[in-house]
């Protein structure tokens, strides 16, 4: 049975840590489905780890729908949250249209958007229409050209603003909030003041849960590993070794072998090629 919004709130109420990970396709979603991870984020981070862009800004709503559909085909247990990408929710009306597309066509169970007090009216409109919304505060990747990639909330004014933003999102009906790249003590304080769950990334252990990028934790991304993540496997090296071995065996003609091939009756092949058929007692099968 798929994770429900009520399950997420119940986990916070019980003090059970929430686990969330990104997934971008059918295969990664299937692998998550083999675990007990209750939340999948189809993040616009795909712009970087899938498309090779330097930020999430170029990602479009149609691309998000495409990847969300693929994830939904591979997932049967997790609550799947789809990102609304840059400039896809500049007005409540546009947000409704694109969030609706992400849920109706993509199939996800909720959407995520970046912003605080300024986005609260949009969040309220979405929630009133039955669209579950996850907020996102702190470092907001879609604003990277304005704020840069650095820790947020380190001044009195900014810390207060983040708290106000979180309270506004909760009041507007958001079911959870991602807190990214903010001081751990501030994230813990915000979490304590909210009734809804917080999910951290680079925000310390005081949040109600954690989200990490698939490629980072599995060692698939060769670029610099951010301080706020941890590599749990080195699949990049494993894949490189496998590809190198595959290429070697193909060049040395040790792959494919007879076990990897099909056979055809020798006389059938000879007749098809207009050649003399084999004599009785000769090998009746030819590998192809």
Curated annotation (Swiss-Prot):
Q: Where in the cell is it found?
A: Cytoplasm
Q: What class of enzyme is it?
A: transferase
Pathway per the UniProt entry:
Cofactor biosynthesis; (R)-pantothenate biosynthesis; (R)-pantoate from 3-methyl-2-oxobutanoate: step 1/2
Q: List UniProt keywords, sorted A-Z.
A: Cytoplasm, Magnesium, Metal-binding, Pantothenate biosynthesis, Transferase
Q: Which residues bind Mg(2+)?
A: 44, 83, 114
A single Gene Ontology CC annotation of this entry is: cytoplasm
The protein's role, per its UniProt record? Catalyzes the reversible reaction in which hydroxymethyl group from 5,10-methylenetetrahydrofolate is transferred onto alpha-ketoisovalerate to form ketopantoate.
What HAMAP family would the database entry show? PanB (MF_00156)
Q: What protein family does this chain belong to? A: Belongs to the PanB family.
- Which PANTHER family is this protein grouped with? 3-METHYL-2-OXOBUTANOATE HYDROXYMETHYLTRANSFERASE
Assembly state and interactors? Homodecamer; pentamer of dimers.
Q: What is this protein's name? A: 3-methyl-2-oxobutanoate hydroxymethyltransferase
The gene from which this protein is expressed is panB
């Amino acid at each position: 049975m798929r994770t429900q919004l009520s399950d997420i709130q119940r986990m916070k109420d019980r003090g059970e840590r929430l686990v969330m990970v990104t997934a971008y396709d059918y295969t990664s979603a299937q692998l998550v489905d083999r675990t007990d991870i209750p939340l999948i984020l189809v993040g616009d981070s795909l712009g970087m780890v899938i498309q090779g862009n330097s930020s999430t800004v170029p990602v479009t709503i149609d691309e998000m729908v495409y990847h969300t559909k693929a994830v939904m085909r591979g997932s049967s247990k997790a609550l799947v949250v789809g990102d609304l990408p840059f400039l896809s929710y500049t007005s409540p009306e546009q947000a409704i249209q694109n969030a609706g597309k992400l849920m109706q066509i993509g199939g996800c169970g909720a959407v995520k958007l970046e912003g605080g007090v300024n986005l609260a009216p949009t969040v309220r409109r979405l929630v009133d229409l039955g669209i579950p919304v996850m907020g996102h505060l702190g470092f907001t990747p879609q604003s990277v050209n304005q704020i840069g990639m650095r820790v947020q909330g380190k001044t009195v004014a900014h810390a207060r603003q983040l708290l106000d933003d979180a309270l506004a999102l909760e009041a507007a009906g958001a079911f959870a909030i991602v807190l990214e790249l903010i001081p751990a003590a501030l994230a813990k304080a915000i979490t304590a003041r909210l009734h809804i769950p917080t999910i951290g990334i680079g925000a310390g252990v005081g949040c109600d849960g954690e989200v990490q990028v698939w490629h980072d934790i599995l060692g698939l991304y060769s670029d610099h590993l951010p301080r706020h993540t941890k590599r749990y496997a080195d699949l990049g090296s494993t894949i490189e070794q496998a590809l190198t071995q595959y290429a070697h065996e193909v060049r040395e003609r040790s792959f494919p072998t007879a076990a990897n091939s099909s056979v055809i009756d020798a006389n059938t092949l000879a007749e098809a090629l207009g050649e003399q058929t084999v004599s009785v007692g000769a090998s009746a099968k030819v590998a192809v």
